[in-house]
Each structure stands twice: as C-alpha cells, then as structure tokens.
C-alpha cells in the first residue's frame, strides 16, 4: 500500500479484507502516503454506520496522535457550547467548530455517508461550501456495500467524475 500510495496520483481502488484485519490502518496508510507524495490536501473517511465511524475515529485519532487536525462530523457530536458554562469562550469555540463543520476545512474529515451524499447532491449552502474541499483530497469509503441499490448509479457517476476531474 505504501508503494501504491506513492505511485498512484488518482483513481478508484478497492480494498477487501476480513473484519478485524486492519482495513482502517491500511487505508489510512495509503492515504497518508498519497497525500505526502502528491501534494493532496485532505483525507476524508466516510462510512454508513455511526458505530463504525466512532470506532474508527478513535483508531484514526490514536494513529495520527494529534486530534486537532481531525474533524468529526456526524449526529453524535455534542457541541461544547451545550455543556460549557463560560458563555464567552463557549461562543468563540462554538463558532470556530461550526465553521469547520460548515466548510470541512480540516486535514482529516471523518463523516457519515449521509453527510457525504448531502454534500454531493443537496443544494443547501453549507453543502455547497463543503464540495470544493474534495479537490485534491483522498476519499476513503468504508462499508460501501451498504449503499442502497437505487443510489448506486448516481454514486458511481460522481465517483468517476471526482476521480478524473477533481
């Protein structure tokens, strides 16, 4: 994977491994090597299941060791504004985090398939602001087999577009 990450600048690749064999580490290693070798800007880790996302977020944070560079965007993230009593610092932190969530302006973005699809296909302004972040990015899609059959055509069109144009 290290060599593939260095040699391949773009494309769509499939990694099949049994559960528990290290797909998260392997795909992350490929992505990091590709980012370093080809001046990519971001790594997106996308999965359909919150439980998988939360589990792999912990693995990715432990592997990368600096969670300041990692943005988690899903429905189980609770804002510190909701739990912090210091209103002034809470408002500033909330605004900064909300900006990152609205823009996905972070080196590593961990999110759900729902957020990914909304960014690609919805016309809401926050989704449009995120879309350009895919340019020069590495997209890792975990559990892709969980996609409903009725979205596969559009999903494949978008993936082909993104792999050749972006």
Predicted stretch roles:
Residues 1-166:
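N-terminal helicase ATP-binding lobe
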């Amino acid at each position: 994977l290290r060599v593939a990450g260095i040699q391949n600048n773009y494309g769509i690749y499939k990694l099949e491994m049994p559960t528990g064999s290290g797909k998260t580490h392997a795909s992350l290693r490929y992505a990091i090597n590709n980012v370093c070798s080809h001046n990519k800007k971001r790594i997106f880790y996308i999965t359909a299941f919150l439980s998988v996302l939360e589990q792999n977020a912990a693995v990715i944070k432990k592997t990368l060791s600096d969670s300041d560079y990692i943005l988690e965007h899903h429905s189980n993230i609770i804002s510190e504004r909701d739990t912090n009593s210091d209103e002034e610092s809470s408002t500033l932190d909330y605004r900064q985090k909300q900006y990152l969530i609205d823009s996905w302006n972070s080196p590593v973005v961990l999110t759900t398939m729902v957020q990914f699809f909304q960014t690609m296909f919805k016309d809401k302004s926050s989704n449009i602001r995120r879309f350009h972040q895919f340019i020069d990015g590495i997209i890792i899609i975990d559990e892709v087999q969980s996609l409903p059959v009725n979205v596969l055509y559009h999903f494949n069109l978008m993936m082909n577009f993104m792999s050749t144009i972006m």
